[in-house]
Amino acid sequence: MANVVVVGTQWGDEGKGKIVDWLSERADIVVRYQGGHNAGHTLVVNGVNYKLSLLPSGLVRGKLSIIGNGVVVDPHHFVAELKKLRDQGVKITPEILRIAENAPLILSLHRDLDATRESGLSGLKIGTTKRGIGPAYEDKVGRRAIRVMDLAETNTLMAKIERLLAHHNALRRGMGVAEINSQALYDELMQVADEILPFMDCTWRLLDESYQVGKHVLFEGAQGALLDNDFGTYPYVTSSNTVAGQACTGSGIGPGVIHYVLGIAKAYTTRVGEGPFPTEQINDIGEFLGMRGKEFGVVTGRKRRCGWFDAVLVRQMVTICGVQGIALTKLDVLDGLDEIKICIGYELDGKRINYLPSSMGAQARVMPVYETLEGWKEATAHALSWEDLPPQAVKYIRYIEKLINARVALLSTSPEREDTILVTDPFAD
């Protein structure tokens, strides 16, 4: 029996959706353990595109899917995404979808605050999706969040709302924004309560019971480890922990329950929003990668910044997340290039270093040190075995493995789930 954590090792958009969908056939349960609806991914199943940003990927396969306590849940978006999937023919009932009773809710006031802050910042733009994720996590840490279970306790809900508004209305007065009426917020929550509560459960107990009888659990991370609130490119990060260890605290399981950590990495690098990006290519190569890779955000539609593979960053996240194997995606995007560069180190103030410093100033000053490899003209798209790959593509993969201290367990050669080469099965006992 094995339980697997899937974590992005870059800045998100690594192709986790396809890999999670591919692995979900081997799993009994799929769990989202952090983030909100700010990070989207697309699944391609039988030619149909499913765009998800909050609901676990396992739903498309009819697997028991859990939204863990580490996720912040926008109840209105939950209802909308549920309807969208159902309209596409996906059958979703409380029997296959559960939400942790102690998951915090994202409210309209969180979205307002997020947008007001982002538009009002002078100089420092974080590049948030303005969906209220950060403010919702602030209220969780500040012990004033409205949680899923509170929707069922209407006799105490108003008191919790008033406590929350004591904080938020003070902020709004300071920003010159109209205050929120407690009854209006109560009514807003009651509009969706009946659609949320049937899915509520004590999910840590459900996971423990499943573990005791040998169920296979797949823990699905959102975003990427380089957006982690502690280990990412702070302050250009998200508001939750995105490293693999968050699978434990974000779902209510112990570290011993995790048997394999699978890191996801693109064969090049992308980033959405602001922040340092040492290997970014603001040139024809960047345009080529963006167009060939269709690099536009699922949630925001924003154009992604593109650059060469950064082995320094991926190796750093492999170490921090305890990654045992890598799923390498979008190798086919590199088809046809005469040469391909890999960042193997940095220069910082005249010195060679092999890690990304935590200091924002140092991160902005590092200069990539590249090694250039010969490209390949043959197609890797839709390859189903190593024998189908050009020799130079295999050489590129092997060099990445050496640089990041992790072997490739899966290789994705197109968005279609069937175009996946399995080297090591993460669920193997």
Swiss-Prot record:
Binding sites annotated in the UniProt record for substrate: V298, V299, T300, G301, R302, K303, R304
Binding residue positions for Mg(2+): D13, G40
Cited CDD domains: AdSS
Binding site for GTP: 12-18, 40-42, 304, 330-332, 412-414
Top-level division of the source organism's lineage: Bacteria
Segments passing through the bilayer: none
Pathway(s) of this molecule: Purine metabolism; AMP biosynthesis via de novo pathway; AMP from IMP: step 1/2
Keywords: Cytoplasm, GTP-binding, Ligase, Magnesium, Metal-binding, Nucleotide-binding, Purine biosynthesis
Catalytically driven reaction(s): IMP + L-aspartate + GTP = N(6)-(1,2-dicarboxyethyl)-AMP + GDP + phosphate + 2 H(+)
UniProt xrefs under Pfam families: Adenylsucc_synt
Family: Belongs to the adenylosuccinate synthetase family.
Name of protein: Adenylosuccinate synthetase
Source organism of the structure: Bartonella quintana (strain Toulouse) (Rochalimaea quintana)
Gene expressing this chain: purA
